Amino acid sequence: MLDPFGKRAESLIREEFGDLLALLERVPSAISVEEPISLVSWMLESENPPQELVEVDNLEELRDLFKFYALLGAASISPYGLEAEVVKRATLRLYSERIKASKNLSETMLPVVPVGENEIPHNDLNILERRMDRNLSPEEKEKLKIKYKIPIKDLLNLWGSSLKEVYIRNGYAYLRWETALKMWEKAFEKRFERAVNILYEYRDELPEFYHRLREKLEEIAEEYFKERGEMFKGTASPLRFDLFPPCVKEALKGVPAGMRNYAITVLLTSFLSYARICPNPPKKDVRIKDCINDLKIIEEEILPVIIEAGNRCKPPLFEDQPHEIKNIWYHLGFGLTDSPTMEDSGNSTWYFPPNCDKIRANAPQLCKPDKYCRGIKNPLSYYLKRLYLEGKKKEGETSE
């Protein structure tokens, strides 16, 4: 399988399973937890994937697809955690090497087609491929050849540089092999991130298989990033208010009567607590006492923010409804109390932040999407995405 998101893969999933969720249900009965690990673990020992992973028999393509989507399902449990990042890096490199070996992009997700023999005017081709330059080696000449064309509308979604660098004719951009491959790599990263965000919404429905696989990936990821001195992402850390999603920022300003309980007790309480204490929950039904040892973080960093936001409401929530503080603790998983202890953690459910569609339905005034909201299904995913992008930005600045 050259591309797990490509045309052949999509056709296979549709014909054999109907949809992606049905495929994910089938995976645990088709492969062991250990099998997908091989697609990632090579990163601990080498810069390049071993040849036995690059050369896959066509008869094994369904099993190969099972392995990739097993990793994707496990990564979706923590879409901006270390596990997802190491899976993305490993599989991107692996499938890129397979495409290089095949010298073919036609079956990938990239909407390119080979360039016809006389499609580009002769004079233009002489300039683009430097055909008159006799100093070029055969390898250099091959690199300069125009191989593919892509519709401009598809190019714009992936191209990060000036269009002055691109030869455009009749609504198509014409690409050399290396440029086309780099665009496929960008497309793979985007599709991977979108897929784990979509699956994140269904993570509680995933079989236990994926949670066990995530634990193994976590071990590999921690070793991989520790050796390279890279930033750990998605771990408990002080709140970054500047990276909060628009709906949370709106709730922090205070809201009118009718929205107060939902905005403060339901949305803010769940979002702030998970964002600060456990942004990437390791399991279903996690409790606060599974993540911290005392109530100091809640009492000093989370509760004051919730109370301040409640006091900005009109009328002020906690002056108008003093008992609502018990509901705050209830939503944090301590039961209906106003003076909890750590032992009370687990007396009720620690509510997870509501998904975006529920926020739109219950408090549409809070929903004011920005450019980072695209593809996001939950406000916590938004925050993790912003933290992730911020970390990547700092890594880039450090390496310069």
UniProtKB/Swiss-Prot annotation:
One GO cellular component, as annotated: primosome complex
Transmembrane segments: none
The keyword Electron transport appears for this protein: no
CDD domains membership: PriL
An MF annotation (GO) of this entry: metal ion binding
Protein keywords: 4Fe-4S, DNA replication, Iron, Iron-sulfur, Metal-binding, Primosome
Residues reported in the UniProt entry to bind [4Fe-4S] cluster: 247, 356, 367, 373
Biological process terms in GO annotation: DNA replication, synthesis of primer
Cofactor info, note text: Binds 1 [4Fe-4S] cluster.
SUPFAM superfamilies the UniProt entry points to: PriB N-terminal domain-like
Entry cofactors: [4Fe-4S] cluster
Signal peptide: none
Family: Belongs to the eukaryotic-type primase large subunit family.
Role played: Regulatory subunit of DNA primase, an RNA polymerase that catalyzes the synthesis of short RNA molecules used as primers for DNA polymerase during DNA replication. Stabilizes and modulates the activity of the small subunit, increasing the rate of DNA synthesis, and conferring RNA synthesis capability. The DNA polymerase activity may enable DNA primase to also catalyze primer extension after primer synthesis. May also play a role in DNA repair.
Record note on quaternary structure: Heterodimer of a small subunit (PriS) and a large subunit (PriL).
The protein's name in its UniProt record: DNA primase large subunit PriL
Species of origin: Thermococcus kodakarensis (strain ATCC BAA-918 / JCM 12380 / KOD1)
